[in-house]
Design a protein with these regions (language model features):
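N-terminal glycine-/charge-rich "phosphate-binding" loop or analogous flexible N-terminal tail
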Residues: 1-41
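Short, well-ordered beta-strand segments
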Residues: 3-4, 62, 84, 136
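Glycine/Thr-rich phosphate-binding loops of Rossmann-like dinucleotide-binding domains
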Residues: 13-14, 52-53, 71, 145-146
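Short secondary-structure boundary/capping segments
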Residues: 18, 34-35, 73-75, 126-128
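A short, aliphatic-rich alpha-helical micro-motif
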Residues: 36-38, 55, 130
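Phosphate/diphosphate ligand-binding glycine-rich loop within oxidoreductases
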Residues: 41-113
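A short, basic/flexible loop-to-alpha-helix module at the beginning of a structural domain
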Residues: 118-128
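Rossmann-like dinucleotide/phosphate-binding beta-alpha-beta segment
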Residues: 126-154
């Protein structure tokens, strides 16, 4: 089996994959060519859609993204190719990042950080409290759910 990995990996991760799939051919390429796609039985990662992924021999496309909308359009993949995504993998990390960015924005932390770096302690806009605020979450998949769960504390 020929496995094409175009997901962003650290060197140690690449080495582990090669060691685990010792009986298979593993090609690791951040920018796969059409020739790489043409020869792959399995693709791990999100290959560019300008490549022809509609290959009869392609058994599976294992995306490293939570969404797969662009890959399910008619003609992108062969009907026999299995498609998976990483839905559920990013909810906690991204939701905590979103909450951190909300607090940073609402409390003008960027302004304060820049002033602190420059040694200036100038009065600045107070900012807005998150407590009892309304938040609109667009999309209620795993990431939206995890954001809502954390915002409930406010």
């Amino acid at each position: 089996m020929k496995i094409l990995v175009c997901a962003p990996l650290q060197e140690a991760e690449s080495k582990k994959i090669q060691e685990y799939f010792i009986n298979d051919t593993v090609v690791i390429s951040r920018r796969p060519t059409q020739e790489d796609i043409d020869q792959a039985d399995v693709i791990v990662g999100n290959p560019h859609l300008d490549l022809n992924l509609n290959q009869e021999h392609l058994q599976a496309l294992l995306l490293n993204s939570a969404g797969s909308d662009q890959y399910i359009k008619e003609g992108i993949l062969n009907k026999t190719t299995k498609l998976t995504n990483a839905s559920g993998s990013y909810g906690i990390a991204i939701s905590e990042h979103v909450i951190g960015m909300m607090i940073t924005f609402c409390k003008n932390l960027k302004t304060y950080a820049l002033q602190m770096k420059e040694g200036n302690w100038l009065p600045s806009k107070q900012g807005k409290e998150i407590y009892h605020s309304r938040v609109c979450i667009v999309g209620y998949g795993d990431i939206g759910y995890e954001i809502a769960k954390r915002l409930k504390a406010f």
